[in-house]
Every structure is written in structure tokens, then in C-alpha cells.
Amino acid sequence: MFYQDPFDVIIIGGGHAGTEAAMAAARMGQQTLLLTHNIDTLGQMSCNPAIGGIGKGHLVKEVDALGGLMAKAIDQAGIQFRILNASKGPAVRATRAQADRVLYRQAVRTALENQPNLMIFQQAVEDLIVENDRVVGAVTQMGLKFRAKAVVLTVGTFLDGKIHIGLDNYSGGRAGDPPSIPLSRRLRELPLRVSRLKTGTPPRIDARTIDFSVLAQQHGDNPMPVFSFMGNASQHPQQVPCYITHTNEKTHDVIRNNLDRSPMYAGVIEGIGPRYCPSIEDKVMRFADRNQHQIFLEPEGLTSNEIYPNGISTSLPFDVQMQIVRSMQGMENAKIVRPGYAIEYDFFDPRDLKPTLESKFIHGLFFAGQINGTTGYEEAAAQGLLAGLNAARLSADKEGWAPARSQAYLGVLVDDLCTLGTKEPYRMFTSRAEYRLMLREDNADLRLTEMGRELGLVDDERWARFNEKLENIERERQRLKSTWVTPSAESADEVNAHLTTPLSREASGEDLLRRPEMTYAQLTSLAAFAPALEDEQAAEQVEIQVKYEGYIARQQDEIEKQLRNENTLLPATLDYRQVSGLSNEVIAKLNDHKPASIGQASRISGVTPAAISILLVWLKKQGMLRRSA
């Protein structure tokens, strides 16, 4: 039977991608249905209890700038906040927060349940309703059918998921949850390329059995950072330390002596695991010269005794896991409360998606999260928001939207996936972006909030706060430009005390701030340039914009040159065998990837600058050279 009311958008899955997709579609005014196998696990942190990090924190800030949920949730649930790379330049600084799993899940669920236009329904999905290559609904486990104009798949590791502990394995979507086998089979019937990936998680330890007195503590930053542009540190719950231990030669001997019982090394697991979050088995074998690896003992929450040992993800048998854990300092008597495991699951080739994350083959069907080959909550959330907003736009008969690589890390993520695909779980790093000086955490709102408002994602409160910040930045920059000090002025001695070389000519506040030794806080502590802005976010922007003005202008020039290639469109139906002068390798790669633009084509491995030149000449001769607005 069909449910009595149709929906505009259906989201299948309530993880980090699904919750952002549902919130985005509903915020845009579309009637949205979120289908999940268990309402109690909405926003569940399946692996590490943390949000953010290098590249990942940038994505969280971008999701927040577009009105998303993740940053607000972690501000309410974070039990330790730190700025990584704090001593480096602003482009690579990143926020990371340890999370209380329960508080995080509660924050997400509360937001979902109070979001207008959103209905949550507990049922596993077993089938899609596809008519004439167009998705029109979904079928649940009990046979109830829902109709919609667009469907977003955010099913994580549940598609034909298989959990491995040693040489034993069983079906599961994650520990304690069933897999989605009927939906996996249905998707394999569609004209989509499917493969298997693998990820893993470490055993969880009972904190009462760890001797923390012999371990180094790691505290959060003070003052505490904040994730959301709308947040403040007063929202953070109680803060707690993490602890550090290390593996040693005894640990490594245990692992080496039991590799024959590892499902990865025994050939039982076929899926490829994450390169940048390897299992402890992989680390010991790949870095054989290392006699120790640092392990962070991270609390799972304020009311939980569970500890997450970050760095010993493993699928070795339980008895070996016990030996590994107890070989480390402070853990000699430790008890495991949940075994570590590896999980294999289906993922679908993201090269079969448009940059909006809609399938090229099934109209109205969108994919987001681990189903696209990514790893990490943050990557999933960013994709979920993009897929949700585009599903909403499609259901309203509007064109899709995707950010450019020069506009957001989300643009880098989607372009990498849709252009290059992936053969291993993809995670975001700042090094993946060509224009990372422009794509900083601190300016995510300046880059994206205006577009978020146009798309219908940004509410009135956020929009008012954003415009107030813009006004504060502009007013303060004008004040510093127009405030001067001369070498002979009474205030010159006070200014010179902060400079490595004294004033030799008249200087404005901006001139002084450009000097590497002068900070905004120091400058505005001087009588001639006081007072400082009360808006800390605006003050940070003033300092960065002034100090890096020349570098930013240079990178903006590079972006404008590259936009010419990005805006030169390639016909979707072009058979590159028609283009004389291209090598067989280039023809095969272009026909396989079907890039949407010259810019995308140039990023495909093996497509040389010479091939791009040949392609441009051929397009011009054929009268097919088109540029987007």
C-alpha cells in the first residue's frame, strides 16, 4: 500500500549524510521524509567520538555556513576543543572536538524533530520505485510505499555489510545493526558501477581498568574554540582531558605473530581500506622501522566509562586484541567492552554522478556519504547537505547547484569524486585544494553564506548576524586605513615598542598590521588605534585580510584564469574517438569519465596539457566550443 501523502524528497538513512540532507531539504520548504531503520540511532557516531581535524574541520565550517547542523551539534556535545596547526598559517589551521556520543546524538535528534516540513519514519527500505529511469519512491520492509519527486541514498556501510573479527564474519551494517541486503541487491540491478570498500574500528576499553596516572594528559585549548559561526563557548559541556600511550615492540610482535589470523592478510577481506586511517596491522607492517606508534585514549562521553583508543583499529581475533591492548603502558590490566572489527560494504562509483550528486542514469536519485566512497562524518555531512539541497531544488523544478573548487572544500570533494572517482575510502585534506589560502575555516561564511541565503538554507537570524559581521569588518578596516601615526608623534614611542624596526615614515593602522611582528590585539591595545572590535570573528578577519592581502589577490588572479577552463563545457554525448590526434589512452579515459568541462578533463590522470590543446582546437573547428555564464 502507498502512504496517504506524497513527499517532495525522501532521505534513506539517518547518519551524518542523511540528517544533513533531511535538514537541508526541509529548510528549503520541501516536504521531506527521513526513513531510518532506528530513530534512536539518528546522528550516531559509529566510529571515533570526534568531529573536525585537518580538512575535515573546514568541511564542518562550510556546512555551518550553509545553515547545516553538524557544527551546532558538536558545540553542544564537545568535551574537548582544540585548534590543530595553531602555530601555522590560517589556511591550514583546523578545529577538532572530542564528542560525548550521547549528547551529540541528542542534539541531532532534537534538531530533526523540531524542523518544520520534516517527517521521520522508522522502517528499513528494501526497494526503490523506478519508472522510465526516474525514481518516484521507496518501499519499506513492511511493504509500505512512499512517493516522492527525489530520493537521496545515505546508507553508510549498511549495503550488504559484512563484519570481520579474525577469520569469523557475519552480516551487519555496523556493530549491533542489521545490514541492508535487499536494497543492495536492488541497486545492483540498476545501471550503476558497484565495488566493495572496507573500514574498521578499534576495541573500546573500560576506563576503570586503565592506569591513567602513568600516562601523559592532553588538554583542550583555553580559551575554547567554537565550531559554529552562530555558537559560543558557553554552550560547551564540561571539558575533559585525553591521554596518550604508545605501542611498543611487544605490541608489534603480537601483531606480526598473528597475521595469519587477520582477515586482511589472509585474503578474506576483498574491499580496500582507508589509506589515511590504517589498521594497527597495516601500520606495523608498512612502517616496520618504527618501534612505537602514538595512541590517544579518548573518552566516549561524560557519563560513559568507555574509552576509544585512537590508533589501534583492528580486525584481529578477540584474544589477539586483548594481547595488543594489554601490551601498552597503563593498559596492563585493561578490559575490552566492545571488540574492534572491520566492515566491508558496497559503494557506487561516484563518476556516475553529476556534481549535484544526482545519478547520471536515474533521474531524481541522489547519493551521499560512504556510498560514494568517502570516509568520515564530515565528508558525509557535506555531501548530505549538497544532495539534500539539490534534491529539494529538483523537486521544485529548479536547476541544481554545486560549489566550484575555488569556492569550497565541498567543491573540491565533489569534483574529485565525480571527475576522478576513488578506489579507496576518500578523506579530505587541505593538500587536496589548489586554492587553500582562499578556503580557510575562518572565512567559510564569507564564501558561502550569501549563496546559502539565495538557496533558502540560511535563516533570518544567521543572515542578520552575517551582515553585522560584514559591516564590522568593513568599518574596522576603514578605521585602520584612516588612522595614522608619524615618527614624531607622541604615540610613536608606544608603537615602536612593538616593532622590530622603528617608524621611519607616517604609517596607517593597516600598514602597521601588515608587519609580521604586529598582531591586531597588540595594535588595538595602543592608545592611537584603540579600541578593538568586540566581535572576535570580525577582528580575526580584519587581521587575516590585511596581513595576507597580497597573497590573496595573487591567488584570486589564478582562480580567474582557471575559471576559463572550468567554464568551457564539454558535450555530455561526445564520443572522444571522433577527436583526431588524441592517444588511445586519453580517448579511453575521457570516454570513461565523461568530464563536464575542460577543467574537469585536465584533472584526469593521464590527460596531458597537449591533449587538452588538441581537444580545444577540435571543439572550435566543430563549432562546439561553449562557455557557461
Curated annotation (Swiss-Prot):
InterPro entries xref list: FAD/NAD-bd_sf, GIDA_C_N, MnmG, MnmG-rel, MnmG-rel_CS, MnmG_C, MnmG_C_subdom, MnmG_C_subdom_sf
Gene Ontology CC: one annotated term: cytosol
GO molecular function: flavin adenine dinucleotide binding
SUPFAM superfamilies membership: FAD/NAD(P)-binding domain
Keywords: Cytoplasm, FAD, Flavoprotein, NAD, tRNA processing
Main localization category: cytoplasm
Localization of this protein: Cytoplasm
Tagged with keyword Protein transport: no
Function in brief: NAD-binding protein involved in the addition of a carboxymethylaminomethyl (cmnm) group at the wobble position (U34) of certain tRNAs, forming tRNA-cmnm(5)s(2)U34.
Name of the protein described by the UniProt record: tRNA uridine 5-carboxymethylaminomethyl modification enzyme MnmG
Organism: Salmonella typhimurium (strain LT2 / SGSC1412 / ATCC 700720)
